[in-house]
Amino acid sequence: MSFRGRGGFNRGGGGGRGGGGFGGRGGGRGGYGQGGGRGGFGRGGGRGGFNRGGYDQGPPESVVEVGEFMHPCEDDVVCKCITQENRVPYFNAPIYLENKEQIGKVDEIFGQLRDFYFSIKLSENMKASSFKKLQKFYIDPAKLLPLQRFLPRPPGEKGPPRGGGRGGGRGGGRGRGGGRGGGGGFRGGRGGGFGGGGGFRGSRGGGFRGGRGFRGGR
């Protein structure tokens, strides 16, 4: 998995139009991910984004419900997001059981903006077959972002751009928010290809991407 250009993206690269949505590995116009796109989630870390990885800090002081187990997918599990106010988990955010035992990390997010799913890349000692239907998983509440961060800004509203943001450290993108186009959904994804209008495609590594996207591979 690699990136060209500073800041986790370069200004070239094809991205679909369309604001507001997530998508996994599945293709389709209006998605952010391998093909690029404006102001959404991206595949991989890069400079100046959220979730560049880092060391394990241990379990948090408290955890909140983030998802329900739906089904296994290869060695990962697919969950329906059940956060309050549809808050969005960071990519690579640790996922726990209720007893704060870490089971893995957020890998991909896909589906409709207000009805979305995510996959968990399990830790080496975990098996997807060991979980039950609708079993709940948990997350550090500090690893959740408000859904409004990924919605297009209303006409005439002033303030910093949504979706991309300036990022942290060097090379943060200036993102243009939700981008042009209609309302959204997540595209593709291993969890079953939830469609919808244009959107962000996102997965491993994390962070928000500004500009027109990035070229990324594995």
UniProtKB/Swiss-Prot annotation:
Entry keyword set: Nucleus, Repeat, Ribonucleoprotein, Ribosome biogenesis, RNA-binding, rRNA processing
InterPro entries: Gar1/Naf1_Cbf5-bd_sf, H/ACA_rnp_Gar1/Naf1, Transl_B-barrel_sf
Record GO biological process: pseudouridine synthesis; rRNA processing; telomere maintenance via telomerase
Cell inner membrane recorded as keyword: no
A Pfam entry, by short name: Gar1
Main localization of the protein described in the UniProt heading: nucleus
GO molecular function per UniProt: RNA binding
One Gene Ontology term, aspect cellular component: telomerase holoenzyme complex
Residue segments, region RGG-box 2: 162-214
Keyword rRNA processing set for record: yes
Gly residues bias: start-end ranges: 1-56, 161-218
Region annotation RGG-box 1: where it falls in the sequence: 4-49
Region called Disordered, residue ranges: 1-57, 149-218
Subcellular location: Nucleus, Nucleolus
Domain of life: Eukaryota
Biological role stated in the UniProt entry: Required for ribosome biogenesis. Part of a complex which catalyzes pseudouridylation of rRNA. This involves the isomerization of uridine such that the ribose is subsequently attached to C5, instead of the normal N1. Pseudouridine ('psi') residues may serve to stabilize the conformation of rRNAs.
Subunit-level organization: Component of the small nucleolar ribonucleoprotein particle containing H/ACA-type snoRNAs (H/ACA snoRNPs). Component of the telomerase holoenzyme complex.
Protein family membership: Belongs to the GAR1 family.
Protein name stated in the entry: H/ACA ribonucleoprotein complex subunit 1
